[in-house]
UniProtKB/Swiss-Prot annotation:
Kinase in keyword set: yes
Domain of life: Bacteria
Predominant cellular place of this UniProt entry's protein: cytoplasm
Cell location: Cytoplasm
Domain Guanylate kinase-like residues, every copy: 4-184
Protein name: Guanylate kinase
Pfam families referenced in this protein's UniProt entry, alphabetically: Guanylate_kin
Keywords: ATP-binding, Cytoplasm, Kinase, Nucleotide-binding, Transferase
Enzyme class: transferase
Organism: Aliivibrio fischeri (strain ATCC 700601 / ES114) (Vibrio fischeri)
Function: Essential for recycling GMP and indirectly, cGMP.
EC annotation from Swiss-Prot or TrEMBL: 2.7.4.8
Length: 207
């Protein structure tokens, strides 16, 4: 059995990366895919569930886990910590399951340094105006927070060229199709197919 592929997915807040990942998993229920549930010190938003959207923990606990080396990557964003469990990622990939990480460019850099075989995808909004409209439509943040997110968006977007793939989320269905195409192409690579069809290939090449 071949190992799963780790996908790093980044985007400015409001570009739709979480929605695209969720839609991908829902539309491919037979595929072995999971989303990594990060740890965070930020407060829980309406509609979120502990252990499903994030593992919500106190700052002191998070810093203890940092000292123990429990995170594959971690970063401080908007005054809150976010981190990814090292053990869970490695065990899940060993089972042949693809894992998706919804993280920012800082975390992506840390992941690539430690796991160079990971594939990375950057989601772009079609315009700054559309990005701001989406942030307002969520109804989750104050005007001040939205202004800060828009200010940070340019910095986040400036790192798009560090990624393997880039998707423009203008039309959601088209963006979702592009995302599925990336996963499909990765699964058709020679090394993956050789492992999956080892017996068939041996039979085809037998004298």
């Amino acid at each position: 059995m071949s190992k799963g592929t780790l996908y790093i997915v980044s985007a400015p807040s409001g570009a739709g990366k979480s929605s695209l990942i969720s839609a991908l998993l829902e539309s491919n229920p037979t595929y072995a895919m999971k989303v990594s549930v990060s740890h965070t010190t930020r407060g829980m938003r309406p509609g979120e569930t502990d252990g499903v959207h994030y593992h919500f923990i106190q700052k002191e606990h998070f810093e203890e886990l940092i000292q123990k080396g429990e995170f594959l990557e971690y970063a401080e964003v908007f005054g809150n910590y976010y981190g990814t469990s090292r053990v869970w990622i490695e065990e899940t990939l060993d089972k042949g399951i693809d894992v998706f990480l919804d993280i920012d460019w800082q975390g992506a850099r840390q992941i690539r340094e430690q796991m160079p075989l990971a594939k990375s995808v950057f989601i772009l909004p079609p315009s700054n105006g559309e990005l701001e409209r989406r942030l307002n439509a969520r109804g989750q943040d104050s005007d001040a927070v939205i202004a800060k997110r828009m200010s940070e968006a340019k910095s986040e977007i400036s790192h798009y060229d560090e990624y393997d793939y880039v998707i423009i989320n203008d039309d959601f269905d088209t963006a979702q199709m592009d995302f599925r195409s990336i996963i499909r192409a990765e699964r058709l690579k020679q090394d993956k197919q050789t492992t999956k069809y080892k017996g068939m290939l041996e039979a085809l090449l037998a004298d």
